[in-house]
Amino acid sequence: MSASTVLPVRDRLRIAIQKSGRLTEPARRLLTSCGLSWRQSRDKLFCYGESLPVDLLLVRDDDIPGLIAQGVCDLGIVGRNELDEQAASRRRNGLPVPYQTLRGLHFGQCRLMLAVPEEWEWQDISQLTGKRIATSYPAILADWLQTHHIAAQIVELSGSVEIAPRLGTADLICDLVSSGATLTAHQLKPVIQIMESQAVLAGMIRQPADARAGLLAMLLRRIDGMVNLRDSNLLMFRAFQEHLDALTRLLPDADPLVQLPDDGSGTLRVQTMCHGTITWQRLEELERAGAQGLMVLTVERSLA
């Protein structure tokens, strides 16, 4: 589809991302790397797609699931924790969940964990019975407590959860943990992981059937081409035929070796995509096994 194609407003794809926060810049970098560019409006909340009919809405992260559910946006980049919290809340209130996770994006990783004061002698989850747990994720926590048959009081807070035990409003907390530095600063220690989270691409379960369908398929393919190649490199080298089996065993995280046309040098030209770190030590090990002229090339994007 040409970038100059003019579509009705309802046929322009809309993507919501966090206006300001830890997912904002990685989300914009991902979309930009997929070939999208925008013209920003005066209020800086709406970005009109220029390279393709794909517009961007800059909103609060906790508004994104609702905007998708209402059909205001077709897609959203949001933390799995926020998406699952609102989905759990809808289910507990007897409401349908009209959105789904389309792709994990492998950035913004964190964990939702129970954390207790450092002076606690933690043994097992039976210690949670009758306790007050402060959290910004009451629906996820309620489901977890119900699954484990634990009767505890949930204290819902919109922020500053980690200070609740020191204020006496809760006995422990359930909150997101990245490095753990915030817990340490508030004399807390993590004891149980409730869930792992990362940034995800979310969208409606019922996909659009108009011109947006083609845009969505194209965008998903480009995102796959970026995300699937994260931490991957193209490895190229020369080797004699009798060394290929040994070299293959040294590349367990690589795609099958591809032999390029013979150039008459007597050795085979070989390339493969490696999906793990290629250190100097690995290159030297490959060289000892018979690889010659080793080259490691960064791959920015790919269409499989």
Swiss-Prot record:
Name of the gene encoding the protein in the UniProt record: hisG
Catalytic activity: 1-(5-phospho-beta-D-ribosyl)-ATP + diphosphate = 5-phospho-alpha-D-ribose 1-diphosphate + ATP
GO molecular function: ATP binding; ATP phosphoribosyltransferase activity; magnesium ion binding
Family matches, as NCBIfam families: hisG, HisG_C-term
Pathway the protein takes part in: Amino-acid biosynthesis; L-histidine biosynthesis; L-histidine from 5-phospho-alpha-D-ribose 1-diphosphate: step 1/9
GO biological process, one term: L-histidine biosynthetic process
Protein name per UniProt: ATP phosphoribosyltransferase
Entry EC number(s): 2.4.2.17
Residue ranges the record marks as coiled coil: none
Keywords: Amino-acid biosynthesis, ATP-binding, Cytoplasm, Glycosyltransferase, Histidine biosynthesis, Magnesium, Metal-binding, Nucleotide-binding, Transferase
Top-rank taxon: Bacteria
Physiological role: Catalyzes the condensation of ATP and 5-phosphoribose 1-diphosphate to form N'-(5'-phosphoribosyl)-ATP (PR-ATP). Has a crucial role in the pathway because the rate of histidine biosynthesis seems to be controlled primarily by regulation of HisG enzymatic activity.
Activity regulation comment: Feedback inhibited by histidine.
Organism, as annotated: Xylella fastidiosa (strain M12)
SUPFAM superfamilies: Periplasmic binding protein-like II
A cellular component annotation (GO) from this entry: cytoplasm
Family: Belongs to the ATP phosphoribosyltransferase family. Long subfamily.
Protein localization: Cytoplasm
CC cofactor: Mg(2+)
Gene3D superfamilies in alphabetical order: 3.30.70.120, Periplasmic binding protein-like II
